[in-house]
Amino acid sequence: MANPNLKQVNIQNNATFPHQQNVTRSTESPGDPKETMEAVAPSPQDPSSANSEPQEMTVDIKNFRRPGEKTFTQRCRLFVGNLPSDMADEDFKKLFFKYGDAKEVFINRDRGFGFIRLETRTLAEIAKAELDGTVLGNRPIRIRFATHGAALTVRNLSPVVSNELLEQAFSQFGPVERAIVIVDDRGRPTGKGIVEFANKPAARKALDHCADGALLLTTSPRPVILEPTEQYDDEDGLPEKLLQKSAQYHKEREHKPHFAQPGTFEFEYSSRWKALDEMDKQQREQVERNIQEAKEKLETEMEAAKQEHQLMMMRQDLMRRQEELRRLEELRNQELQKRKQIELRHEEERRRREEDMIRHREQLDIRRQPDGFKSGFMESREQDMRMNEMGTRGAINIGDSFNPVTAISGNQGPTQMMGMGGRVGAMGPDGSSKMIPDNGVMPNERFSEGGPLQMGSPVGGQTGVDSPQPQQHSPMLVGAGSVPGVLGQSGFGRGSPVGGSFDGPNNKRRRY
């Protein structure tokens, strides 16, 4: 059973095959040679079949595609001229049906030409070779490759530029169909290339940008130069059948090609034409040499300037880094100063907190002291106050008269000293104890030289009987005179003006 995806195509070649061949296009399995390419030849046992049946061949159209080749490009576009005026679009498509899919079909019936685009360049070449000169409506058609209006020529290319790099560089302006670096017969780059875009706007954009700016393909500051490609037909050329048979044609074609004989008119002017061509050649060579020398000089200057530029960039980079380091050092110093200030502030705050804590702790210690210590402290304070008052009263009462009867007969109450509940008496020189009278007058035996004070002794001959009056703290005053029977032989040693010198009201006992 035949494959429904295969198409029957007829390829005629009278020089090789005397009979018509049917070529079928396959798109299903290009990898299987049995399915993609079959040649059904006539059987050797039946020689008559070779004359009666045409040869059939199944051809995969993908075999006509080069590796990496793009399809339906401008290079696959054919120009068809001398078409009949009544040519329909469907008939025009059927003309190229056996060569695969076709796109961009255009016909201008008024002027008798059209365009069609096939899948690959190879198929377009096959169609051109087979259909060129085919008679349609008593008119032979002419088929040529259409002019590529979006092709650009690139000059001043570096020797390290490849086809891929060239395509990558110009892809920014639009889709690139083909990019080729032209090389000589030894494969060395000539510094020229061709870039073919898919449409004219992309080519125009590339021309404008490269004319206004400088497109660099490598690190070398060597810009590429773009210009429209000059279209030449170096394949078909100009056949004899296409020449117009004018009067000039017949005049020039009277003589066959021949060499001019020396000494003739033809030889003289032929020599002058050759001399002009030689001068043109020499001038072109001289210009090329001058241009080459200028290029080499520019290359040398460019290398020197490049090194100088690199050194300058290194200096600038070094200065920038030094400036950055200096700025970082300043920032670091400022940060250190800020840290020192913060540390000093924290230290001051810590010291204040410690002082506050110590002060608070002392207050807590004072509040937590026992009651006995507090009462003793208060009594010592009261005793100091009494001593101060006693010194003041003694100084005032030095010249006053003292009534011994009142001092003796008055009721004497006990005086509390230093938090003690017992009576405090004074021992006289005879060993009898004397108490402080109730009238608040201190007997002079307290400061006598006879003996120390004694506690618990009776006052004025009494035997230590408690006074019925309540105990009261009276200020002790120093008397001026001596009382017989109560005081000793000597009175005030220091406070009396008689017994000794008077030190004044500021004479106080030391606290400790």
From Swiss-Prot:
Domain RRM: 76-148, 150-231
The keyword Zinc-finger is annotated on this UniProt entry: no
Major localization listed first in the record, in broad terms: nucleus
Compositionally biased spans, kind Polar residues: 1-29, 46-55, 464-474
GO molecular function, one term: RNA binding
Coiled coil segments of this chain: 276-366
Annotated family: Belongs to the PSPC family.
Descriptive protein name: Paraspeckle component 1
